[in-house]
């Protein structure tokens, strides 16, 4: 916990309060953690969800660590699953999302793109500190 607290930037007491609150929740109800190949494991987990559930697969700053081929495979995998796909990745990380941006990725240094089901909705700060919606409605 002390290490995590050290990662909160000075002068941000609200973030420190949120971190401590989140840690308290996590300690009370620890998350299930699964390991394995991203593409295979995500498919298994989505398939295991109750049929009546709306499954949301969310990732942030994950796909940049995969090869381009693995990213393309992930997109094919996720689009074939009965789920909503919410991503928060660097502007050029998901090629099909980058192709839909209102300005080239090179014009948005340090920004991430929030996308729902592969449709970009807005630019976000890399640590979630800002969110600027595009003109179209973020909800569909």
Regions found by a protein language model. Name each.
Residues 65-116:
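C-terminal substrate-binding/active-site "lid" region of AdoMet-derived donor-dependent transferases
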Residues 37-49, 71:
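A short, acidic, amphipathic alpha-helical segment used as a generic capping/interface helix at domain edges
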Residues 55-68:
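A short SAM/SAH-binding and catalytic strip from SAM-dependent methyltransferases
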Residues 38-40, 62-64, 92:
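Short, glycine-/Ser/Thr-/acidic-enriched flexible segments
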Residues 101-140:
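A cross-taxonomic marker for long C-terminal extensions/tails that follow the last structured domain
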Residues 54-55, 83:
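Conserved acidic residues
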Residues 36, 58-60, 88:
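Generic beta-strand/beta-sheet core signal
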């Amino acid at each position: 916990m002390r290490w995590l607290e050290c990662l909160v930037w000075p002068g941000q007491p609200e973030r420190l309060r949120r971190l401590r609150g989140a840690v308290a929740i996590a300690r009370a109800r620890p998350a299930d953690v699964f390991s394995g190949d991203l593409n295979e494991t995500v498919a298994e987990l989505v398939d295991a969800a109750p049929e009546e559930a709306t499954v949301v697969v969310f990732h942030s700053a994950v796909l940049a660590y995969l090869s381009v081929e693995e990213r393309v495979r992930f997109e094919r995998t996720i689009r074939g699953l009965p789920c909503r796909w919410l991503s928060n990745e660097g502007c050029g990380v998901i090629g099909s999302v980058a192709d839909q941006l209102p300005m080239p990725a090179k014009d948005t240094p340090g920004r991430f793109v929030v996308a729902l089901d592969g449709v970009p909705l807005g630019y976000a700060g890399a640590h979630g500190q800002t969110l600027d919606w595009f003109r179209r409605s973020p909800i569909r």
